[in-house]
Amino acid sequence: MEMLQGLLLWMLLSVGGVWASRGPLRPLCRPINATLAAEKEACPICITFTTSICAGYCRSMVRVMPAALPPIPQPVCTYRELRFGSIRLPGCPPGVDPMVSFPVALSCHCGPCRLKTTDCGGPRDHPLACAPQTSSSCKDPPSQPLTSTSTPTPGASRRSSHPLPINTS
């Protein structure tokens, strides 16, 4: 009887874990829209733009007795397919490349974290945003698409959540 109770408890916990991972509180790994900041040290203006990144829940496990066995590799939500987009930073001095490239997620999957290409979490040396300055360095996105031949007209506000058209050629 005790073995049957243990088996029943194990089944309930297993099924409950699956239900919890598929619920609305934990969306699965998928491309989502995110607003990022682009800046270069020599260029005076930082701009925000919207692109797609990989984000969401990946099933993982933690050992009950971590000291007895080596850690289990934890999957992360990462790119399956991607392309690169680019934007032109306005106001860069001559001799400084004003183009900034960034990945655009086409599809995502749960897989190992590759430190060369992926932010695997943990502490950061700097925030992923425009550096605070005495003057306003972050600008609203321009009204026209950014390509290698167009330059945005700086806006007046500090931040924007409006999408910035990007060149993804």
Swiss-Prot record:
Gene Ontology, cellular component aspect: cytoplasm; extracellular space
Alphabetized UniProt keyword annotations: Disulfide bond, Glycoprotein, Hormone, Secreted, Signal
Renumbered residue ranges of the record's region Disordered: 131-169
Low complexity bias (residue ranges): 145-158
Molecular functions (GO terms): hormone activity
Pfam family, one: Cys_knot
Alphabetized InterPro entries for the sequence: Cystine-knot_cytokine, Glyco_hormone_CN, Gonadotropin_bsu, Gonadotropin_bsu_CS
Keyword RNA-binding: no
CDD domains, A to Z: GHB_like
Location(s) in or outside the cell: Secreted
PROSITE patterns named in the record: GLYCO_HORMONE_BETA_1, GLYCO_HORMONE_BETA_2
Gene Ontology biological process terms, A to Z: G protein-coupled receptor signaling pathway
Disulfide bonds: 29-77, 43-92, 46-130, 54-108, 58-110, 113-120
Major place of residence: secreted
Signal peptide (UniProt feature, chain positions): 1-20
Residue positions the entry lists as glycosylated: 33
Complex formation: Heterodimer of a common alpha chain and a unique beta chain which confers biological specificity to thyrotropin, lutropin, follitropin and gonadotropin.
Function description: Promotes spermatogenesis and ovulation by stimulating the testes and ovaries to synthesize steroids.
Family: Belongs to the glycoprotein hormones subunit beta family.
This protein's name: Lutropin/choriogonadotropin subunit beta
Protein species of origin: Equus asinus (Donkey)
